[in-house]
């Protein structure tokens, strides 16, 4: 009887440890992405590819895209926060 109880405790602790370990591995925090209007773009933004290239090359952003913000389309750059 004592061996059975000990075996149950060992099995339970092993499963608990595995669940806690897998829970920590499965959780990966997502980095936040910050958006701000391009400081180097002039005029209306029509082509997102051009905006993306300018944000990446000139402003060291991860990416860029055209979005509407009153009163026109603007180039927005995306950075890791």
From Swiss-Prot:
The keyword Disulfide bond applies. Residues 1-31 form the signal peptide. InterPro entries: Defensin_plant, Scorpion_toxin-like, Scorpion_toxin-like_sf. GO terms for biological process: defense response to fungus; killing of cells of another organism. Disulfide bonds join 34-81, 45-66, 51-75, 55-77. Keywords: Antimicrobial, Disulfide bond, Fungicide, Signal. It comes from the Eukaryota. Belongs to the DEFL family. Antimicrobial peptide probably active against fungi like B.sorokiniana, F.oxysporum, F.graminearum, F.avenaceum, B.cinerea, P.beta, P.infestans and P.debaryanum. This is Antimicrobial peptide D1. It comes from Stellaria media.
